[in-house]
Amino acid sequence: MTLFTTYHEAIEWIHSRLAFGVKPGLERMKWLMDRLDHPEQKIKAVHVAGTNGKGSTIAFTRSILQSAGYSVGTFTSPFILTFNERISVNGEPILDEEWLSLVNEIKPLVDELDDTELGAATEFEIITACAFAYFAHVHQVDFVLLETGLGGRLDSTNVAAPILTAITSIGHDHMAILGDTLDQIAAEKAGIIKAGIPMITAVHQAEALTVIQHKAEEKNAPFISLHDTCTFKDQQPTETGERFTFTTPKREYSQLETGLIGTHQMQNASLAVLLIEWLEQEGYIHVLNEQVYEGIRQAVWAGRFEKVQDQPLVYLDGAHNEEGMERLIETVQAHFSSKQVHVCFSALKDKPYKQMIEKLERISSSIHFVSFDFPRAESAEKLYVCSHLEAKTFDEDPRAVLDFIQKKRDDPSAMILVTGSLYFISDVRSLILQ
């Protein structure tokens, strides 16, 4: 049996499984978990689904737990800086040699699974299985914050036995798999709800909220709606984030300050606070008020309205659907109304990029379209044709973003906004920081 001798071989093998595409369903994961001695049942997991806001909510929750002295594992996707960050402990990606060891443990099982009627394991299934094995058998932590990859009901992560579940938001994304309407999409996300396990949600649309609440009632799971039970006031942007007062049924958090910029980050931070309150109520943790404040203030999450350069001002944001783009535009208008906004945009072929471009044109002085090295990336020219803005250019080479930024170097009124895809901003981030 051939095992890998280097990290790069191991990761190349994982990426080669992209050829098997996305195959919703839990049968292969259950098969793998059974043969790995059920690591998914040996961790204290908080399971987070949602169209947008999953990563930021996890970042806030992790930061609060760490401030209170707990060790926290996270499983998130996609990666922004390095592949390793998908499995992290206290914000630190696991080591190359740990990945190599995990892959060598799981590869013989995957080879065996390939020959069964269940069929070949996908890239995401293998990465998810590695995460469960790592947190159960290699590096035990107090809590694991588990982000769904796509949907919820049939997502690979849904073999977990969580102590708490959350849905951040419902919007239009992955509709070919999850359904066209908000209630259909909500039903898929609500598939993470487990019998008797609390579900906390920041979803606000009535039709989606009703579906989630009904599923919780079916499962006899305590149900908490952030927007029905909590209030926001005194909201104002700061230089590095947002300041607001948030009141839950338990207490008031006056003048909370986020370390992440964006009006939507108030909701993500507040959902994290509710998760913390419930973990405390259930007896899992003890957290002081000042640790909540510190955690919210210190949370960081790459690629979410992230400043990567000062001259000219360059921000990266992973907005990749209509709702995400609306939130991004609100953020730019709240924080940078005096700036000339120049957008660098790219997107995947299966995203609603025409609608995203249309929204961006409301705040853009110019748009520069590029493509990037990814199987589903749309061509820059096709994106360019969709725009009605006069000041527009395109280049198929992602490195053209650097020239675009360079040209604005001496313009103090300019702000460069790189957006449209998490995969795209990951590439651009590497280019800029090199």
Predicted regions and their residues:
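Short functional linear segments
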Residues: 1-50, 57-59, 63-70, 75, ...
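Short Gly/Thr/Asp-enriched flexible loops that form oxyanion-binding sites at enzyme active sites
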Residues: 61, 153-163, 429-433
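C-terminal helical cap/extension that packs against the catalytic core
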Residues: 205-215, 220-224, 313-316, 322, ...
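Conserved catalytic-core segment of NTP-binding enzymes
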Residues: 149-153, 160-220
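Beta-strand->loop->alpha-helix junctions that form or flank phosphate-binding loops
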Residues: 202-203, 215-237, 258-263, 291-298, ...
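Active-site-proximal loop/hinge segments that shape catalytic or ion-binding/gating pockets
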Residues: 421
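Nucleotide phosphate-binding/pyrophosphate-handling subdomain across enzymes
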Residues: 42, 138, 143-148, 154-166, ...
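ATP-dependent carboxylate-amine ligase catalytic core
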Residues: 33, 38-41, 67-160
